[in-house]
Amino acid sequence: MADFDEIYEEEEDEERALEEQLLKYSPDPVVVRGSGHVTVFGLSNKFESEFPSSLTGKVAPEEFKASINRVNSCLRKNLPVNVRWLLCGCLCCCCTLGCSMWPVICLSKRTRRSIEKLLEWENNRLYHKLCLHWRLSKRKCETNNMMEYVILIEFLPKTPIFRPD
């Protein structure tokens, strides 16, 4: 029985090495940055809907634009409420010793989760079939030292056909 476990571990190591080798050859992810004029806790009020040239041949520009529009509509729905609570929280911050900022933090977290769920739905619906994976990621801004949320479009390695499931 111990020999069986050792063989299993060797096969597992081979699979892990093969996956790492496939990840080495995948191209750099595409970054879709926020292009809005309002940013609350690093989350912009809209993302760029311009089709990146590196996705040519992978996904249709119409599908890309539809996905970005879904994310932007989610932001359009949630962000005005967050801004109102942020202004209210800033006005009352001194009186409440900072506790008035908690609703803004919770609403911001809820907005991020709803976008992550939307991106996961998009991945399951379309993009995983095209060997792409969309996710919300925190990155450093190009212009200053602050952090911002961006959409990363990663290229998934194709699984070899000759390997059984």
UniProtKB/Swiss-Prot annotation:
Record's signal peptide: none
Motif CHIC motif (Cys-rich) positions after renumbering to this chain: 88-106
Topological type in the membrane: Peripheral membrane protein
Keywords carried by this UniProt record: Coiled coil, Golgi apparatus, Lipoprotein, Membrane, Palmitate
Coiled-coil regions listed in the entry: 1-26
PTM comment: Palmitoylation in the CHIC motif is required for membrane association.
Cellular location(s): Membrane; Golgi apparatus
GO biological process, one term: Golgi to plasma membrane transport
A GO-annotated cellular component: Golgi-associated vesicle
Keyword Protease: no
PANTHER family, per the entry: CYSTEINE-RICH HYDROPHOBIC DOMAIN PROTEIN BRAIN X-LINKED PROTEIN (PTHR13005), CYSTEINE-RICH HYDROPHOBIC DOMAIN-CONTAINING PROTEIN 2 (PTHR13005:SF3)
Family, per entry: Belongs to the CHIC family.
Protein name as annotated: Cysteine-rich hydrophobic domain-containing protein 2
